């Protein structure tokens, strides 16, 4: 069967690979130049910077990591350090840097300003968040948004807005209003593993290596948006602005 897939993000590429391996003929259409999933990855100093950040908790990224293993993509553990510069709207100076402990992989404040000016508030916020998450997963009312969760819990503002939310913005790549409307459960599960010190994984070669394996042997028409999706009898015509079908 000839199958068209619109979009080459994670969902589109995974579907394309699975259908290709099942014997179908696949064509991918992508509006952006190149491939959607790794279109913002940057080569720098002999390495690759993935944007958005592609670090995966093995408990939460089981399907992605299973697909990577199936394709022969190897992973390696990483310690995620932080540098926080967003706290007040009128200032963007770095106010906090962290590393990780050798035992337990827990975050450690390692700059003087972070310790002297905000240390207690950050420790307090961490304890408040861990307590709130623990209570959330013990409760029966887990069908709430992230905004509702934060409104129901007293968590130190500097910690929540200066540390936690920038991490979520980086992972989810969306604005505050959108992320506030997300179901809290999945995000809190992520934060629980993060604050517990779970080791995260990266793919060897970064996202581009993963994308290369996903699209191997598959035609992709990129750099042109879809202009027509039309039912023609028992088939569907897909055409982009360049006229590719």
Can you name each region flagged by the protein language model?
Residues 2-28:
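N-terminal Rossmann-like FAD-binding beta1-loop-alpha1 element of flavoenzymes
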Residues 20-44:
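Glycine-rich FAD pyrophosphate-binding loop
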Residues 25, 74, 220:
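Residue-level detector of anion-binding/catalytic polar loops
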Residues 41-65:
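N-terminal glycine-rich dinucleotide-binding loop that anchors FAD/FMN and/or NAD(P) in oxidoreductases
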Residues 58, 62-180, 193:
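Mobile amphipathic helical/loop "lid" adjacent to a hydrophobic cofactor/ligand pocket
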Residues 187-235, 240:
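Helical element adjacent to the flavin cofactor pocket in flavoenzyme catalytic cores
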Residues 241-245:
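Core beta-strand elements of the Rossmann-like FAD/NAD(P) dinucleotide-binding domain
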